[in-house]
Structure formats: C-alpha cells, structure tokens
Amino acid sequence: MLITSSRKPSANTRTMCKYLASFFNCKYMTRGKMGLIDIVSLCENGLLMVVGDYHGSPGSIMFYDSHGVELLSIHLSVFYPDGYKYTPLKALEPSINGDGELFNLLSYYLDIPEGECYYDSKCLIASDDHLEFVYLDNMLFRLNIKNYRKMVMSE
C-alpha cells in the first residue's frame, strides 16, 4: 500500500499521512503535481490511500485499486487525545478488530489480520462510526466517521 495526500496538504494532513504510513508499515509519498494514475503506477500491490484535506485538517480517506478506480471513500474528522505528539512507531504487524460493514471493507482492502488488541501491538478498532488507532495499549488518534461510500462493482 502507498499513502499520499491531496496536492496541497496542510501540516496536519501531512502528519496524519506519516502516522498512517508508520502504523501500516508502508510508504508515504508527497504527491506534488503528480496525477492519480502516476501515483497508482508506483503502488507495489496496487492499493493507494489518499488522505484529503478539509479546512486545514484531514477530512477524507479514499482507497483506489491498481487501475485508479475508487474502492472506498470515507469522510471524517480527527480526534487526538491530550498530549498527542507524532513519533514513529515500531514495525509491529498491525491487526484489525471490530464489527460492521466498514470493518469488513477495511479488513478486506487493507489485508491485515483480524485479531485481538494486546498491550504490545498495533491495532485498528473499526466500526461504522469511528476508527481507533491503538499502539502499545494507548489510543494514538480516532477518526470519527461522518459517512462512507463503497464502490459498487458491476457484474
């Protein structure tokens, strides 16, 4: 998976991209003037995550396949706990836990194992109204889901 941002991201959005890349053990790349197809062609396994900006903060996350087709779009707001400060995370394998349609979609697209959250791990707790990113038993941040849209595949 490759993570990038909108073309002119705010500092908050760039920080969120770095945190997501560190959490998922993948690469973050600044987009600059590159088009979506140019970025997609650089993806190793074909999954691209684009973090969009809204009024100076991360406002959306979109997932694209290897052909640049949108798979999932999530509109969100971000909550950081008191004392939040970005630090790189250890390269532990993340797991996902939760319930609901969004959990199933993320589990499928991100291709990370489903499992319990332990005190010495990275875990994404997913439901249809929020995504909590947990590291070493502490919440890093929470994405409050405003709405999401999945791509409907034609038969």
Curated annotation (Swiss-Prot):
Any one of the GO BP annotations: rRNA processing
Matches recorded under InterPro entries: Brix, Brix_dom_Rbsml_bgen_prot
Molecular function per GO: rRNA binding
Keyword line: Ribosome biogenesis
Ranges annotated as spanning the membrane: none
Domain of life according to the entry: Archaea
PROSITE patterns cross-referenced by the UniProt entry: BRIX (PS50833)
UniProt feature coiled coil, ranges: none
Keyword Amino-acid biosynthesis: no
UniProt domain Brix: residue ranges: 1-155
Annotated disulfide bonds: none
Function: Probably involved in the biogenesis of the ribosome.
Protein name: Probable Brix domain-containing ribosomal biogenesis protein
Annotated source species: Methanococcoides burtonii (strain DSM 6242 / NBRC 107633 / OCM 468 / ACE-M)
